[in-house]
Amino acid sequence: ICTNNKKIFEISKMLRSHGMVREAKNSIFEKKIINKHKYLSKKFIFLYPTLNFRNNEIGATIGLNQLKSLDKNNIKRKDNFIFFLKHLDEKKYFINFDLIGSSNYAFPLILNTKSLKVRDKFEKHLTVNNIEFRRGNAGGGNQLRQPYIKEFVKIRDFSNFKNVERIHFFGYYIGNYPNLKKEKIKKIVRILNNIKLSS
């Protein structure tokens, strides 16, 4: 796409990247949208219904090459997740996941709190300890709250969607890389278990 129209330029960047606001790379525009949608995770606001068109031939080649180790990596990820859950404080975090047939590229983490104040403190603690995370699990949380879907689905009362609402506000993903060592997982869990999750 070639354009000298700034609006089309910004929209095009979002359209190639899941419709995510952060991909516009325009801080003034981004700030305006974040302020308008304060109930969404600021890194995962989707304005347009679209796909991910960012990849290229190099990405495809890397992806095809990674398929060779897919089965091995899936086993490692599952083992990592079981190890992670085994050491996690169940008073602070939900740990009762169905693991049958599951291999997750991340550690899903759900807080056992309903306090936004506690949640915000939790996020600061992760940031200070250099633990990268996504709130709302894979990103974006409750899709019914996302701007892109509002013209298709007219739901404004989210009380019938208790589970996804809990994930939206108190669910996280932390990376589960196949080469993640047990010592590193222990360190992450130690940090998580030491966070005071009370008001």
Task: Pin down the residues of each PLM region.
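PLP-dependent enzyme catalytic core of the Aspartate aminotransferase-like
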Residues: 150-199
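Secondary-structure transition into beta-strands, especially the periplasmic turns and strand N-termini
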Residues: 6-7, 115-118, 125
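Active-site region of PLP-dependent enzymes
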Residues: 1-106, 141
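Short beta-strand-to-loop capping motifs
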Residues: 3, 109-113, 176
